[in-house]
Amino acid sequence: MSDYKDTLNLPKTSFSMKGNLANKEPMILNKWEKQGIYKKIREHFAGREKFVLHDGPPYANGSIHVGHAVNKILKDIIVKSKTLSGYDAPYIPTWDCHGLPIELQVEKKHGKAGQKISEDAFRKECRKYAKQQVEIQKKDFKRLGVLGQWDQPYLTMDFSYEANMIRTLAKIIENKHLTKGFKPVHWCTDCGSALAEAEVEYKDKISPAIDVKFKIKDKEKLAKAFGLESLNHDAFAIIWTTTPWTLPANQAIAVNNQLNYSLVKIEDFYIILAENLVEQTLKRYAIENAQVIANTSGYKLIGIIAEHPFYSRHVPILHGDHVTDDSGTGMVHTAPTHGVEDFTLGKEHDLSMEIFVKGNGCYSENTKLFAGEFVFKANDRVIELLGEKKRLMNFDKLKHSYPHCWRHKTPLIFRATPQWFISMEKEGLREKAIEAIKETSWAPSWGQARIEGMIKDRPDWCISRQRTWGVPLPLFIHKETEELHPNTIEILHKVAQKIEKGGIEAWFNADDNEFIAETDKYKRVKDTLDVWFDSGSSSMCILDIDKSLSYPADLYLEGSDQHRGWFQTSLLVAMSAKGNQPYKEVFTHGFVVDEHGRKMSKSLGNVTSPQDIYNTLGADILRLWTASTDYKSEMAVSDQILKRTADTYRRLRNTARFLLSNLEGFNPETDIIEFDKLVKLDQWAIAKTKEFQDKIIEAYDKYQTHTVAQLIHHFCSIEMGSFYLDIIKDRQYTAKADGHPRKSAQTAIYHIVHALVRWMAPILSYTADEIWEATPKTTDLPIQLCEWYTDLKSFNDQDELNLEFWAKIQEIRSEVNRILEIKRNEEVIKASLEAEIIIYADNDNYKLLEKLGNELRFLLISSKASLRAIEEKTNNSIESNITGLNIEVNKIEEPKCERCWHRSATVGQNEEYQDICSRCVENITTEAGESREFA
């Protein structure tokens, strides 16, 4: 027996079977950095149509988590796909660098600003800390394979950014959107500052729920309101509240003049309740022997005076539109400095706006009975006092959704303070923002209704904060009238110039007379800007200024929580400063959860860190998981899910390796065969690749990365692995190395690889780079500078052996394989090359299959295949799942060719080559080798 190994075209490639990504990827990343690959992309695509994905800044505090990784990877995939489509698609990362979380970290080390450390030194430490955090996060983002302008990102603490925020504020003031107000705002007693809507999160809280008796001072007036001559017992208005601590600030009781109210007798006193709530309220009180004495309309109660339950204070009954008879008692406790509706009612009726609660959450010195106590701790004292005064009608506990600080996770209070607001009404900002939302494309589509509803319902945006590490609100107000300085716009531009040179410290360290002359009449505002104003200004501070970008951005892509965060603040800043929206399209992705749909938390032990993933499996596995998941809803990840992703990756890598290994010896400059001269199956492979490429590009354009991933996987495992590559192995390995059949297949493989590597590049960025290095090519460009492959061809209308034809062949082949498997299990054959396959076909199937002539056997990977009319079917044939098709499989008794392993009667016919078939002899001894037309 001779050794024919040297006569075979054995596969060979530098592209390894094992990914070994955790070790290889850092080397590839290092190569990109040495090449300056991002800069080369910018130079190569300069002058092309722009596509700008604007980066929402992550907060510069702590290591990145898998949610950060998902966000950056999705952005990177989209930007890279747009580059492949020929766009100039820059990506400039940004970071959010001011605010409380950084202050808290610095406080841990240095103490509070103004106590153990000066405010100036504190700011320097904050800046230093933020810079360190940016570098930590940047390293992780780069390791994920994300390309961008990492050497010059935008930081909200850059002097130029801080200065441009002040200029943006100037435009907002110029457009008359800024107002000063004394209003109740969400207040965090731990932060000692007001919070914006985006900084508030709602969690369940158990609160005391009490019904309080307010004694009616004028019983005669009350009797008259109910159509009675007199009342022989005391009467009480009953309010229900879950915030007993606000009772010291009570100034009124609100009723609705459109509701009906009942006077109810209980033993020796009367209570007033909304008529529709009498039954359920008495049931709540467990009172059975009460009697409704009379009913009246709410408007008749207006103006009646009650007495505060523990202060000598008259409390009027007033009308409030917000009062309903859905729950409670239909009479609402009104503390103007602790609620939005209460405040509005207080302003309407000139109620006292005395502040009883300080910024630290403790009652002020002028709060009788409770001075110095923390409000939530005072709840018990208030309830106890009400009991002593016999003013507590009922006491329960209620579990309800309550606002909490996003950072401290502690309950907030509503507290009226003087603050600066962007008014939603003053210049029609609300309506303009809603119109802009309608002009923007939102995906998923429910995002539009969500943000629209939020804008419709949101209060004025409180943009002032009482913090140390933040961009100042550099205003001067009159010491007596508190009006803004008449030259405010000019002053702000002067401040911006100073900040551009010396950062925010230049404002805090400057004297007032550096900005204004009338320091005796005007005082500076000491507040800082809400950090959401920082990130919300990015369209004005980056897109509107950086000439390498464009305004508005083509795309904003963030997590679904940003409808109430960055999407909204960006819109409000842009609309109030510039008058149009900052984005054309807004996409959101879901949150990352574990495989059971639970939020990730250290306490549950279900945290999957991106660092662990890329240090073990590789960043490309994380990228593939991200792309494969439909990110419009929650994205589940776990070790098991990532293991499945790694299995998918292996299949893709193996396909790429098989393709590359069969391009050994192929020179694209001399060996490419024209499409119409290719073996028909190779024509199909190219046309099928073209069909998939069209779908893949369409999916990329729609940002449907999961569809892209599915298409690539299907292409590799089904169209290639289970069909085309399986069939061409024989031709690739055994045909003459430079003969037409092999060069035809290599031409198809060359085109397939060039298309496939580009499809993969946005998702499997490291692997695509590795594939590209091992690919024969006619260009020196790195894969990152390439565009979609354009040398693919489709069948024309005259081609009989078109995609439809081959789809039917694939269907028939699947049935043949099914029956071959049956015969393997029955031990009739061990391998398909031992089989003789006879297909009995009806007229339509016969006409289809006879087009392949004697090459049908190559498609079926058998040594012998024949076609007969269905009428000739034998009892040995098996009916297939295709109508009009029976299949018979018999074992071939002919000898095995030691070179191609086919069974053939021609083995031994050549005296020089006794153990191989005539086809192999032809491939070894003749100049042209065998010929193929179809397969």
From Swiss-Prot:
Residues that hold ATP according to the record: K602
Protein function: Catalyzes the attachment of isoleucine to tRNA(Ile). As IleRS can inadvertently accommodate and process structurally similar amino acids such as valine, to avoid such errors it has two additional distinct tRNA(Ile)-dependent editing activities. One activity is designated as 'pretransfer' editing and involves the hydrolysis of activated Val-AMP. The other activity is designated 'posttransfer' editing and involves deacylation of mischarged Val-tRNA(Ile).
Cofactor, how bound (note): Binds 1 zinc ion per subunit.
Binding site for Zn(2+): C897, C900, C917, C920
Assembly and interaction partners: Monomer.
GO biological process: isoleucyl-tRNA aminoacylation
A GO term, aspect molecular function: ATP binding
Cofactor(s) the protein needs: Zn(2+)
Residues the entry annotates as binding L-isoleucyl-5'-AMP: E558
Source organism of this protein record: Francisella philomiragia subsp. philomiragia (strain ATCC 25017 / CCUG 19701 / FSC 153 / O#319-036)
Name of the protein in its database record: Isoleucine--tRNA ligase
HAMAP family referenced in this protein's UniProt entry, alphabetically: Ile_tRNA_synth_type1
Pfam families xrefs: Anticodon_1 (PF08264), tRNA-synt_1 (PF00133), zf-FPG_IleRS (PF06827)
Residues spanned by motif 'KMSKS' region: 599-603
Protein family (similarity comment): Belongs to the class-I aminoacyl-tRNA synthetase family. IleS type 1 subfamily.
Motif 'HIGH' region per UniProt: ranges: 58-68
